[in-house]
Amino acid sequence: MKTVTINKGMYFGKEISGTFELLGEWFPDNAPVDAQGDGKVFVEIDGKRRGVWVYKSDISYDGVKVEEVKESYEDMKTRINKRFNVMGMMTNGIINGNIRSLIISGAAGIGKTYSLDKALNKANDIGYIEYKSINGKISGIGLYEQLWNNREENSVLLIDDVDVFSDMDILNLLKAALDTGETRKVCWSTASSYLEEKGIERELEFKGTIVFITNVDIDRELDRGTKLAPHLQALVSRSVYLDLGVHTNEEIMVRVEDVILSTDMMQKRGLSDEETYKALSWMKVNVNRLRNVSLRTALYLADFIMTDKNGWEEIATGYSSEINS
């Protein structure tokens, strides 16, 4: 059991001190404006898990003062590549029917959907699976219709970056469909003329495979105990869950650089190798000025270079200033 000694912490205006079992911690790169410390440690208070605001100088683990260990670039790259390799193996599991339910978490614009979608489309084209993907906005009844249409054993339904957390109907449908139990019963309990007209029954047994991709940092939300946490816990407890470990700007930049240097995506945009390195260098220098760091950002830079090979940095600086205004 790992313990944390809090010399001084704050929990809803109350000063906290003492030695506790460490249940979790959250120390963001950039703390919120209203932060009452460097971050939070999660301990048990009055029989419940609570997040206590602390400064790192005011805590120690197992009697040893906290020393922040920064992950090296190479270690971060290795860790991220391993996660993406695992996603590739899980994709094979989806195609061969061994994995029936999967949740993937990772930042936007890092290529997670692209590689998965490419493999599933290939499997669809040669007849291994019946593949369908949905993204953007969908209603509860719209999701139920998709589950009905893709309920058979060889069907794979990919739900990509759909806002499921603001609609309880969608959440409840996902909970039922993502369940790894032997029988997955999914119901639409409200009478619906739309379903009747389509010949869709209001209860189905879902035998297909479902993959839910989200940009939400699920582990962080669970550790912080946010209002989303109970819903996220309900989803990940029912399904195979993979966190790609790419959420901070630094992690995203490591992933972006690796993809760019191992593919010809920038060259296809018209850039030479030298220009590609210049674009990457600009991104790394300005990574903390950019609101969004992603593969799309790199492609924007490629377009700026092709627009004006001498003045592209001025365009890029204006772009980064605009999105931070």
Swiss-Prot record:
GO terms for molecular function: ATP hydrolysis activity. It comes from the Viruses. Gene3D superfamilies: P-loop containing nucleotide triphosphate hydrolases. InterPro entries: AAA+_ATPase, P-loop_NTPase. This is Uncharacterized 36.7 kDa protein in nrdC-mobD intergenic region. It comes from Enterobacteria phage T4. The lineage of its organism: Viruses, Duplodnaviria, Heunggongvirae, Uroviricota, Caudoviricetes. The gene is y05F.
